[in-house]
Swiss-Prot record:
PROSITE patterns: COX1 (PS50855), COX1_CUB (PS00077). InterPro entries: Cyt_c_oxase-like_su1_dom (IPR023616), Cyt_c_oxase-like_su1_sf (IPR036927), Cyt_C_Oxase_1 (IPR000883), Cyt_c_Oxase_su1_BS (IPR023615), Cyt_c_oxase_su1_dom (IPR033944), Cyt_c_oxidase_su1_bac (IPR014241). Its main location: membrane. Cu cation binds at residues 258, 262, 307-308. This is Probable cytochrome c oxidase subunit 1. Keywords: Cell membrane, Copper, Electron transport, Heme, Iron, Membrane, Metal-binding, Respiratory chain, Translocase, Transmembrane, Transmembrane helix, Transport. SUPFAM superfamilies: Cytochrome c oxidase subunit I-like. The gene is ctaD. It is found in: Cell membrane. GO terms for cellular component: plasma membrane; respiratory chain complex IV. Pathway: Energy metabolism; oxidative phosphorylation.
Amino acid sequence: MDITTTEIYHDDHHTPHGWKRWLFSTNHKDIGIMYIIFAVFAGIVGGLFSLLFRLELAMPGGTFLNHDFQLYNVLITAHAVIMVFFMIMPALFGGFGNYFVPLLIGAPDMAFPRLNNISFWLLVTAFILLMGSAFVDGGPGTGWTLYPPLSNLSGHPGAAVDMAIFSLHLTGLSSILGSINLIVTIFNMRAPGMGLFKMPLFVWSILVTAFLIILAMPVLGGAITMLLTDRNFGTNFFKPDGGGDPVLFQHLFWFFGHPEVYIVILPGFGIVSQVISTFSRKPIFGYQGMVGAMVIIGFVGFIVWAHHMFTVGLSYNALIYFTAGTMIIAVPTGIKIFSWIATMWGGSITFPTPMLFSIGFIILFTIGGVTGIILSNSALDRVLHDTYYVVAHFHYTMSLGALFTAFAGFYYWFGKISGKQYPEILGKIHFWITFIGVNLTFFPQHFLGLAGMPRRIPDYPEAFAGWNMVSSIGAGISMAAALYFVFIVFYTLKYGKDCPNNPWGDGADTLEWTLTSPPPFHTFETPPHIEG
């Protein structure tokens, strides 16, 4: 190949066209966009499932689902698994992580582009398997926790739970491969001059999350494989009549399950740090403290799992340890909350939609954190365990908290991804509808839990009817807000104004704002040099 043809070859971006561009893509931006589109689709499906069982719970009597309480449990299971594994993780970790980590560190792409492709398509396959399981033998009505004996052959004799287990295996594999890719990218492909402590906090949050996934996911894989062999190959890991112990499954599941909570929320912490710094026009307060807080949250998150199991008969010493350990997690989390507030303090603050969602996140996450401190007390948890108080707590933290950070990131970066800037008034309307809807849904559930209403039941005494109706109305408003969000996306893509390279002004000082909107197919082929 002579010099002229080489130059021509390098001058062309060789962007593939049509469906092959997406199916075979190894470009981190295309794969990030596919993750985000998939997450929005899965979120709508999971949200519709929750609306169905909120309609069932709107009034006592169990009439909406025609007394099909197995279907109710299948909806609960599918809603939880979809929202955790197919909505929040693909949006925050897969979507924004894939798209923006290489841009934020000045890398040309991810370290392993083909691995990136299979990570995404494994997730789609897992989603199809999970949806299919709902139509097999009555569906998996176990809850997302898959506790035996309900998930054993005695509780679910058909193939539904086996399909759900394979779905979880595939989504776990997808997450692990994506994590390896991101860790290698962050450690090996930073631009010259960008030390670890010059990286934006979003990159740090993805790095910590990736390590959590690699350490936690194999434990889930082991637990559900043992469950699979109990169901199909005559082992007795969790069958008491064969010398097994169902509580062992709970230990294994929650050793994964509690770090999973931080896997869900940590990338959101990173997004909020970027957004608040940008719109306060100040560097983040206590950068190294914020990094340290994330690392400590990740570490302590692994050693408090049994606070999900305070009522299974743990020893007195174990109760003391897990109560104290759980309360300690509030310290690094508090460091982050107060650092965000300190960043805003004295800043030149503006309030576009991403900033509203970030402030909404701080409010919601703080409410959820306070109820978490109450639940961390094993004595109080004896009363509150498996009531709607717990439902309210974890929705305020990992659900609403993570959702609001995802919306903050979406509005913050949508112009950069698409080249079209959303109309600010539409974004603000979306924020207020969502904020009112989710609070109307979940705040009354604190009262229901304190009054003694248990989780995972399709019918209830009339004493609980009032707040359940309020909660169901809130769910309807929240679903309307989600559909309105989809409308905003399509409206912006069709009628939105062209987005400048940096729509946010001086506060946005990370590398992605030096590129065009949308960025070219290949970026940073010559690495930028970071100074200062």
